[in-house]
Swiss-Prot record:
Residues 90-105 have a biased composition (Basic and acidic residues). It is found in: Cell inner membrane. InterPro entries: Membr_insert_effic_factor_YidD (IPR002696). GO terms for cellular component: plasma membrane. Keywords: Cell inner membrane, Cell membrane, Membrane. It comes from Chromohalobacter salexigens (strain ATCC BAA-138 / DSM 3043 / CIP 106854 / NCIMB 13768 / 1H11). Belongs to the UPF0161 family. It comes from the Bacteria. It is a peripheral membrane protein. Pfam families: YidD. This is Putative membrane protein insertion efficiency factor. Could be involved in insertion of integral membrane proteins into the membrane. Residues 76-105 are annotated as: Disordered. Its main location: membrane.
Amino acid sequence: MRPGKRRPLTRLPFALLSWGMIGLLRVYQYGISPLLGPRCRFWPSCSQYAVEAIQVHGPLKGAWLALKRIVKCHPGHPGGVDPVPPGPHETPRKTSTHDDEPPSR
């Protein structure tokens, strides 16, 4: 790219969509969720998962991941720890497993 030339604004619509979606999620988190009380079976909560998924994967894939997570959040599912999958440029997060511990005797 030559000096003085601007990059095309192809990412702007996705950034605006991400900001809008995260803004709506924040309204839910701070305005509605406290009135309903804790209901999510997972950690992080479904709304926080959605925010993180949008931040890591963008608005389209992030919304898809959030929708899949919300569908799993029901009384028949045990819940538990369910982190957002790593993005294309992230190293996978290591969840707490007992593989590191020596075998018990």
